[in-house]
Amino acid sequence: MSSKKNKPNPTPAAKPKQVAQDKQPRLWPWAAGIAAFSFLLYLNTVNYDYVLDDFSVIKENFVTKRGFEGIPDLWKYHSRHGYWNSVGELYRPIPMTMFAFEWAIAPDKPTLSHFMNILLYALSGALLFVTLARWMRDYNLLLPLLATLFFVAHPVHVEVVANIKSRDEIVMFGFATLALFFLHKYLTTNKIGAMVASLVSYTLALFSKENAVTFVAIVPLMMYFFTKSDLKKIVLTTLPFILPAIIFILMRKAVIGSLTNPGETYSLDNILVAAKGGAYYANAFLLLGKYLWSLLVPYPLCSDFGFNQIPLTNWGDWRVLLSLLAWARAPK
Protein backbone atom coordinates (compact mmCIF):
# COMPACT_ATOMS: atom_id res chain seq x y z
CA MET A 1 0.00 0.00 0.00
CA SER A 2 1.23 3.47 -0.71
CA SER A 3 2.06 5.65 2.27
CA LYS A 4 1.21 8.84 0.37
CA LYS A 5 -1.76 10.77 1.61
CA ASN A 6 -4.45 11.68 -0.82
CA LYS A 7 -4.27 15.37 -1.70
CA PRO A 8 -7.50 17.33 -1.41
CA ASN A 9 -9.18 18.06 -4.68
CA PRO A 10 -9.14 21.85 -5.26
CA THR A 11 -12.11 21.75 -7.61
CA PRO A 12 -14.85 22.21 -4.95
CA ALA A 13 -13.35 25.60 -4.06
CA ALA A 14 -14.94 27.04 -7.20
CA LYS A 15 -18.46 25.98 -6.17
CA PRO A 16 -19.38 28.99 -4.01
CA LYS A 17 -18.82 31.28 -6.99
CA GLN A 18 -21.04 29.09 -9.16
CA VAL A 19 -23.76 29.05 -6.51
CA ALA A 20 -23.61 32.85 -6.25
CA GLN A 21 -24.08 33.12 -10.00
CA ASP A 22 -26.99 30.71 -9.91
CA LYS A 23 -28.83 32.81 -7.33
CA GLN A 24 -29.81 35.31 -10.01
CA PRO A 25 -32.00 33.62 -12.64
CA ARG A 26 -31.58 34.49 -16.29
CA LEU A 27 -33.41 37.78 -16.68
CA TRP A 28 -33.33 38.53 -20.38
CA PRO A 29 -35.85 35.84 -21.45
CA TRP A 30 -38.32 37.33 -18.98
CA ALA A 31 -37.45 40.81 -20.22
CA ALA A 32 -38.09 39.74 -23.82
CA GLY A 33 -41.49 38.42 -22.77
CA ILE A 34 -42.35 41.73 -21.11
CA ALA A 35 -41.25 43.64 -24.21
CA ALA A 36 -43.39 41.42 -26.44
CA PHE A 37 -46.38 41.77 -24.10
CA SER A 38 -46.04 45.57 -24.02
CA PHE A 39 -45.60 45.78 -27.78
CA LEU A 40 -48.68 43.68 -28.53
CA LEU A 41 -50.71 45.51 -25.89
CA TYR A 42 -50.32 48.83 -27.69
CA LEU A 43 -49.94 47.64 -31.28
CA ASN A 44 -53.45 48.84 -32.06
CA THR A 45 -52.26 52.46 -31.66
CA VAL A 46 -49.89 52.20 -34.63
CA ASN A 47 -52.50 53.55 -37.07
CA TYR A 48 -53.63 56.44 -34.87
CA ASP A 49 -53.41 59.99 -36.19
CA TYR A 50 -51.93 63.15 -34.66
CA VAL A 51 -53.74 64.31 -31.51
CA LEU A 52 -53.47 66.97 -28.80
CA ASP A 53 -49.91 68.35 -28.50
CA ASP A 54 -48.70 66.37 -31.53
CA PHE A 55 -49.64 69.41 -33.61
CA SER A 56 -47.50 71.88 -31.67
CA VAL A 57 -44.35 69.74 -31.70
CA ILE A 58 -44.70 67.93 -35.05
CA LYS A 59 -47.43 68.55 -37.60
CA GLU A 60 -47.65 72.35 -37.21
CA ASN A 61 -44.07 72.96 -36.04
CA PHE A 62 -42.10 74.44 -38.94
CA VAL A 63 -38.75 73.62 -37.30
CA THR A 64 -39.58 69.93 -36.91
CA LYS A 65 -40.93 69.83 -40.48
CA ARG A 66 -37.58 71.00 -41.82
CA GLY A 67 -36.32 67.52 -40.98
CA PHE A 68 -32.57 67.11 -40.67
CA GLU A 69 -31.97 70.80 -41.42
CA GLY A 70 -34.05 71.87 -38.44
CA ILE A 71 -32.24 69.76 -35.84
CA PRO A 72 -29.68 72.44 -34.81
CA ASP A 73 -32.52 74.87 -34.05
CA LEU A 74 -34.25 72.26 -31.90
CA TRP A 75 -31.24 72.49 -29.56
CA LYS A 76 -31.08 76.31 -29.73
CA TYR A 77 -34.72 77.15 -28.99
CA HIS A 78 -37.56 75.91 -26.80
CA SER A 79 -39.59 72.96 -28.04
CA ARG A 80 -42.54 74.96 -29.38
CA HIS A 81 -40.46 77.66 -31.07
CA GLY A 82 -41.58 76.38 -34.46
CA TYR A 83 -45.25 76.52 -33.42
CA TRP A 84 -45.42 79.99 -31.91
CA ASN A 85 -42.77 82.66 -32.01
CA SER A 86 -42.98 83.62 -28.34
CA VAL A 87 -41.63 82.69 -24.94
CA GLY A 88 -41.79 78.98 -24.11
CA GLU A 89 -40.99 76.89 -21.07
CA LEU A 90 -40.23 73.47 -22.55
CA TYR A 91 -36.71 72.43 -23.53
CA ARG A 92 -36.70 68.81 -24.68
CA PRO A 93 -34.27 68.58 -27.61
CA ILE A 94 -33.81 64.79 -27.70
CA PRO A 95 -37.43 63.79 -28.45
CA MET A 96 -37.77 66.81 -30.74
CA THR A 97 -34.71 65.61 -32.66
CA MET A 98 -36.33 62.19 -33.01
CA PHE A 99 -39.49 63.79 -34.42
CA ALA A 100 -37.42 65.71 -36.97
CA PHE A 101 -35.68 62.48 -38.05
CA GLU A 102 -39.02 60.72 -38.46
CA TRP A 103 -40.51 63.61 -40.43
CA ALA A 104 -37.47 63.61 -42.73
CA ILE A 105 -37.85 59.87 -43.32
CA ALA A 106 -41.65 59.78 -43.62
CA PRO A 107 -43.15 63.30 -43.87
CA ASP A 108 -46.61 63.65 -42.35
CA LYS A 109 -46.81 59.90 -41.67
CA PRO A 110 -47.75 59.43 -38.00
CA THR A 111 -47.59 55.64 -38.32
CA LEU A 112 -43.78 55.65 -38.05
CA SER A 113 -43.86 57.83 -34.94
CA HIS A 114 -46.57 55.71 -33.32
CA PHE A 115 -44.53 52.59 -34.06
CA MET A 116 -41.49 54.17 -32.42
CA ASN A 117 -43.55 55.02 -29.33
CA ILE A 118 -44.73 51.43 -29.04
CA LEU A 119 -41.25 50.00 -29.56
CA LEU A 120 -39.54 52.34 -27.10
CA TYR A 121 -42.24 51.76 -24.49
CA ALA A 122 -41.78 48.00 -24.84
CA LEU A 123 -38.00 48.29 -24.52
CA SER A 124 -38.28 50.57 -21.50
CA GLY A 125 -40.55 48.01 -19.83
CA ALA A 126 -38.00 45.25 -20.43
CA LEU A 127 -35.22 47.44 -19.07
CA LEU A 128 -37.31 48.31 -16.02
CA PHE A 129 -37.73 44.63 -15.19
CA VAL A 130 -34.02 43.83 -15.51
CA THR A 131 -33.08 46.88 -13.45
CA LEU A 132 -35.58 46.13 -10.68
CA ALA A 133 -34.57 42.47 -10.62
CA ARG A 134 -30.92 43.39 -10.09
CA TRP A 135 -31.63 45.95 -7.41
CA MET A 136 -34.03 43.51 -5.71
CA ARG A 137 -31.94 40.39 -6.16
CA ASP A 138 -32.54 39.39 -2.52
CA TYR A 139 -36.27 39.18 -3.20
CA ASN A 140 -38.28 36.62 -5.10
CA LEU A 141 -38.11 37.31 -8.84
CA LEU A 142 -41.90 37.37 -8.87
CA LEU A 143 -41.89 40.76 -7.13
CA PRO A 144 -40.06 42.79 -9.84
CA LEU A 145 -41.89 40.78 -12.51
CA LEU A 146 -45.35 41.66 -11.17
CA ALA A 147 -44.32 45.26 -10.49
CA THR A 148 -43.17 45.66 -14.08
CA LEU A 149 -46.27 44.04 -15.55
CA PHE A 150 -48.44 46.30 -13.39
CA PHE A 151 -46.51 49.30 -14.67
CA VAL A 152 -46.55 48.54 -18.40
CA ALA A 153 -50.20 47.46 -18.44
CA HIS A 154 -51.61 50.24 -16.26
CA PRO A 155 -54.29 52.23 -18.16
CA VAL A 156 -52.88 55.61 -17.08
CA HIS A 157 -50.03 54.99 -19.53
CA VAL A 158 -52.33 54.72 -22.54
CA GLU A 159 -51.92 58.40 -23.43
CA VAL A 160 -48.14 58.17 -23.10
CA VAL A 161 -48.01 55.59 -25.88
CA ALA A 162 -50.92 56.77 -28.02
CA ASN A 163 -49.88 60.45 -28.00
CA ILE A 164 -46.70 60.84 -30.08
CA LYS A 165 -45.66 63.98 -28.20
CA SER A 166 -45.39 61.89 -25.03
CA ARG A 167 -42.25 60.35 -26.50
CA ASP A 168 -40.52 62.73 -24.09
CA GLU A 169 -41.93 60.73 -21.15
CA ILE A 170 -40.95 57.38 -22.65
CA VAL A 171 -37.41 58.40 -23.58
CA MET A 172 -36.84 60.19 -20.27
CA PHE A 173 -38.02 57.14 -18.35
CA GLY A 174 -35.89 54.80 -20.46
CA PHE A 175 -32.70 56.80 -19.94
CA ALA A 176 -33.40 57.28 -16.21
CA THR A 177 -33.93 53.54 -15.82
CA LEU A 178 -30.73 52.89 -17.76
CA ALA A 179 -28.94 55.21 -15.34
CA LEU A 180 -30.17 53.06 -12.44
CA PHE A 181 -29.09 49.92 -14.29
CA PHE A 182 -25.52 51.18 -14.67
CA LEU A 183 -25.49 52.59 -11.15
CA HIS A 184 -26.23 49.14 -9.76
CA LYS A 185 -23.44 47.73 -11.92
CA TYR A 186 -21.07 50.33 -10.48
CA LEU A 187 -22.09 49.50 -6.90
CA THR A 188 -21.53 45.78 -7.46
CA THR A 189 -18.35 45.94 -9.55
CA ASN A 190 -16.81 49.29 -8.54
CA LYS A 191 -16.02 49.97 -12.21
CA ILE A 192 -15.73 53.66 -13.01
CA GLY A 193 -16.97 53.02 -16.55
CA ALA A 194 -20.32 51.93 -15.18
CA MET A 195 -20.62 55.14 -13.17
CA VAL A 196 -19.77 57.20 -16.24
CA ALA A 197 -22.43 55.32 -18.24
CA SER A 198 -24.94 56.03 -15.48
CA LEU A 199 -24.16 59.76 -15.51
CA VAL A 200 -24.37 59.92 -19.31
CA SER A 201 -27.72 58.12 -19.25
CA TYR A 202 -29.02 60.56 -16.65
CA THR A 203 -27.86 63.51 -18.74
CA LEU A 204 -29.77 62.14 -21.74
CA ALA A 205 -32.85 61.74 -19.54
CA LEU A 206 -32.63 65.40 -18.54
CA PHE A 207 -32.48 66.54 -22.15
CA SER A 208 -35.53 64.38 -22.89
CA LYS A 209 -37.79 65.89 -20.24
CA GLU A 210 -37.19 68.26 -17.35
CA ASN A 211 -38.80 66.15 -14.63
CA ALA A 212 -35.79 63.82 -14.77
CA VAL A 213 -34.20 66.28 -12.34
CA THR A 214 -36.08 64.46 -9.55
CA PHE A 215 -33.87 61.45 -10.27
CA VAL A 216 -31.26 63.04 -7.98
CA ALA A 217 -33.55 62.09 -5.09
CA ILE A 218 -34.19 58.57 -6.42
CA VAL A 219 -30.51 57.57 -6.30
CA PRO A 220 -30.09 57.83 -2.50
CA LEU A 221 -33.50 56.25 -1.94
CA MET A 222 -32.61 53.21 -4.06
CA MET A 223 -29.30 52.84 -2.26
CA TYR A 224 -30.93 53.22 1.15
CA PHE A 225 -33.65 50.63 0.60
CA PHE A 226 -31.88 48.09 -1.62
CA THR A 227 -28.22 48.15 -0.61
CA LYS A 228 -26.25 47.99 2.62
CA SER A 229 -24.42 51.24 1.87
CA ASP A 230 -23.76 53.58 4.77
CA LEU A 231 -24.70 57.26 4.73
CA LYS A 232 -21.26 58.38 3.54
CA LYS A 233 -21.35 55.99 0.58
CA ILE A 234 -24.86 57.12 -0.34
CA VAL A 235 -23.92 60.81 -0.26
CA LEU A 236 -20.67 60.37 -2.20
CA THR A 237 -22.43 58.30 -4.87
CA THR A 238 -25.30 60.78 -5.24
CA LEU A 239 -23.17 63.92 -5.51
CA PRO A 240 -21.92 63.29 -9.10
CA PHE A 241 -25.52 63.25 -10.35
CA ILE A 242 -25.95 66.86 -9.30
CA LEU A 243 -23.48 68.00 -11.98
CA PRO A 244 -25.55 66.88 -15.02
CA ALA A 245 -28.61 68.47 -13.40
CA ILE A 246 -26.78 71.79 -13.02
CA ILE A 247 -25.51 71.63 -16.61
CA PHE A 248 -29.03 71.02 -17.91
CA ILE A 249 -30.55 73.79 -15.77
CA LEU A 250 -27.97 76.28 -17.02
CA MET A 251 -28.51 75.26 -20.66
CA ARG A 252 -32.27 75.46 -20.23
CA LYS A 253 -31.91 78.93 -18.73
CA ALA A 254 -29.70 80.00 -21.63
CA VAL A 255 -32.34 78.83 -24.12
CA ILE A 256 -35.53 79.88 -22.35
CA GLY A 257 -34.12 82.97 -20.65
CA SER A 258 -35.71 82.45 -17.24
CA LEU A 259 -36.13 79.62 -14.77
CA THR A 260 -38.82 81.11 -12.56
CA ASN A 261 -41.01 82.96 -15.08
CA PRO A 262 -40.68 81.58 -18.63
CA GLY A 263 -44.07 82.96 -19.56
CA GLU A 264 -47.59 83.45 -18.28
CA THR A 265 -49.47 80.33 -17.22
CA TYR A 266 -53.20 80.33 -17.88
CA SER A 267 -55.98 78.62 -15.96
CA LEU A 268 -56.98 76.81 -19.15
CA ASP A 269 -53.72 74.87 -18.85
CA ASN A 270 -53.45 74.66 -15.07
CA ILE A 271 -56.53 74.99 -12.86
CA LEU A 272 -54.38 75.86 -9.84
CA VAL A 273 -53.69 79.25 -11.42
CA ALA A 274 -57.34 80.19 -10.81
CA ALA A 275 -57.21 79.09 -7.16
CA LYS A 276 -56.16 81.81 -4.74
CA GLY A 277 -54.93 81.74 -1.16
CA GLY A 278 -55.78 78.65 0.87
CA ALA A 279 -57.93 77.32 -1.97
CA TYR A 280 -54.72 76.75 -3.94
CA TYR A 281 -53.52 74.11 -1.47
CA ALA A 282 -56.98 72.59 -1.12
CA ASN A 283 -57.16 72.01 -4.87
CA ALA A 284 -53.56 70.78 -4.93
CA PHE A 285 -54.47 68.06 -2.43
CA LEU A 286 -57.60 67.28 -4.42
CA LEU A 287 -55.41 66.64 -7.47
CA LEU A 288 -53.02 64.50 -5.43
CA GLY A 289 -55.98 62.45 -4.27
CA LYS A 290 -57.21 62.16 -7.85
CA TYR A 291 -53.82 60.84 -8.96
CA LEU A 292 -53.79 58.29 -6.13
CA TRP A 293 -57.33 57.16 -6.96
CA SER A 294 -56.47 56.83 -10.66
CA LEU A 295 -53.55 54.60 -9.72
CA LEU A 296 -55.84 52.25 -7.79
CA VAL A 297 -59.05 52.65 -9.81
CA PRO A 298 -58.17 53.98 -13.29
CA TYR A 299 -61.71 54.87 -14.32
CA PRO A 300 -62.81 57.22 -15.69
CA LEU A 301 -59.64 58.58 -17.27
CA CYS A 302 -59.04 62.02 -18.74
CA SER A 303 -56.37 63.11 -21.20
CA ASP A 304 -56.06 66.59 -19.69
CA PHE A 305 -56.99 67.87 -16.24
CA GLY A 306 -57.32 71.38 -17.64
CA PHE A 307 -59.85 74.04 -16.71
CA ASN A 308 -63.09 72.74 -15.18
CA GLN A 309 -62.33 69.07 -15.74
CA ILE A 310 -62.04 69.10 -11.96
CA PRO A 311 -64.06 72.10 -10.69
CA LEU A 312 -62.33 74.28 -8.10
CA THR A 313 -63.16 73.51 -4.50
CA ASN A 314 -62.12 74.46 -0.94
CA TRP A 315 -61.16 72.94 2.42
CA GLY A 316 -64.80 72.14 3.16
CA ASP A 317 -64.78 69.44 0.47
CA TRP A 318 -64.64 65.94 2.00
CA ARG A 319 -62.53 64.74 -0.93
CA VAL A 320 -59.81 67.25 -0.05
CA LEU A 321 -59.80 66.12 3.58
CA LEU A 322 -59.75 62.46 2.58
CA SER A 323 -56.81 63.08 0.25
CA LEU A 324 -54.94 64.97 2.97
CA LEU A 325 -55.54 62.08 5.38
CA ALA A 326 -54.41 59.49 2.83
CA TRP A 327 -51.15 61.27 2.08
CA ALA A 328 -50.53 62.04 5.76
CA ARG A 329 -50.81 58.33 6.58
CA ALA A 330 -48.66 57.22 3.65
CA PRO A 331 -45.56 55.20 4.64
CA LYS A 332 -42.64 57.50 5.41
Task: Annotate each language-model stretch with its function.
Residues 2-332:
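Polytopic membrane enzymes that build or remodel cell-surface glycoconjugates and lipids
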